[in-house]
Amino acid sequence: MDIQLKRGLLDVCVLAAIRSEDSYSYKIIKDMKPYIELSESTLYTILKRLESSDMLTVRTAEHGGRLRKYYHITDKGLKRIEDFKKEWDEILSIYRFVTKEDNDE
């Protein structure tokens, strides 16, 4: 898969994982596991990229005597999800065209 396409898909997946509530890295990985395997190092790279793009914010809070980073989606992150939904319709249309051509031969 094209690296740019995969990066975009993973970014949106992480945003979707935190859209309904603030979350921390372990829970994000756990929530995404039924859909996609994601290593901690990959997730941290994505989280840093999304934070630097102002699509999420980070806060630190104590949990069980330890500090934990919680990630919160911003309005810009929510807009990215909505934009992705619109883009996906176009991607599906292209996919249908490509697979139709393959099947017609």
List PLM regions with ranges.
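Residues that scaffold the ATP/ADP-binding catalytic core of kinase and kinase-like folds
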Residues: 17, 80-81
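N-terminal helix-turn-helix DNA-binding core of bacterial DNA-binding proteins
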Residues: 2-42
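Short, flexible micro-motifs
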Residues: 11, 68, 80
